């Protein structure tokens, strides 16, 4: 399973999730300006020192213990990307996924790694975000030990060669909206890279959000950097070169809507070169679901998320109250059984 390691600029300030045991209080607000390269280098070095103090500890079954990197036993490769690799490893009796990212002198890349670490450690109490057991920082790399999931949704679509049923997407929607809502309400964090490759599924049917390297700290509920994220899932307001305004979580709502269309149809809704696709996002009417194939509530949910004007899109509280989401939160859907069936069909 190939994984997409999109890593982005971290926020200024302390490492709320890396400063020892998990903490519940909100982190300090960052200064509302872009630091110079030299100040950012200094900031990254300080944050790395904080992180190093808690390197080598794993929290397993509620117990935090000092661990030796040598005790991690390699099992198999899971995937790789331009910025790192993921392997399946065993620590004593626990199977885990270990994401290894090289340490570099590039403060931009290191701030991304630190951001990913920070968010995943902060989110220890959220059942909809992939769980982190701990991490190891060496002179050469950073290794993050996480729960081992079965696959990500983009690789699943490629493997099963068919769309994901609406009833399964309903359960996926509940989990992802709750994960995004948690990040916003509890930590004032915006994911900024919502897409199928960052949604994980395990064999028990549990759905979780991952990859927080380019998440952004919100200042008065708004984000200011427009570079972060995969452009093919960005809202028009983030792609428009003439738009210099900040944006809010409703940009992630657009990304969520595009993801829903891709899962429901089995393919990304725009065609052509990357330039062509970005041009269509900016200029064409947003994609819609075929009402002959999907329920009215599902079609309306997608339509509400994919509004060109971001102020017309719902926020997370509104999404959680949407009839499609409310319905699928209440009903029982055997995601585990469906997943086992489709994986069995494709060998």
From Swiss-Prot:
Q: How is its activity regulated?
A: May be activated by phosphorylation at Ser-221 and Ser-225.
Q: Which cofactor does it need?
A: Mg(2+)
By what name is this protein known?
Dual specificity mitogen-activated protein kinase kinase mek-1
Q: Which residues form the active site?
A: 193
Tell me what PTMs the record reports for this protein.
Answer: May be phosphorylated at Ser-221 and/or Ser-225 by mlk-1.
Give all residue intervals belonging to the Protein kinase domain.
72-325
Species this chain originates from = Caenorhabditis elegans
Phenotype upon knockout is: Loss of kgb-1 activation. Hypersensitivity to high concentrations of copper (> 50 microM) and cadmium (>5 microM) and to food starvation which is characterized by a failure for most animals to reach adulthood. The few surviving adults appear starved and are defective in egg laying and are infertile. In addition, have moderate susceptibility to pathogenic bacteria infection characterized by a shorter lifespan and a substantial decrease in pmk-1 phosphorylation. In absence of stress, animals have no obvious phenotype.
Q: Which residues carry this modification: Phosphoserine?
A: 221, 225
| Upper taxonomic lineage | Eukaryota, Metazoa, Ecdysozoa, Nematoda, Chromadorea
GO molecular-function term, one example from the UniProt record: ATP binding
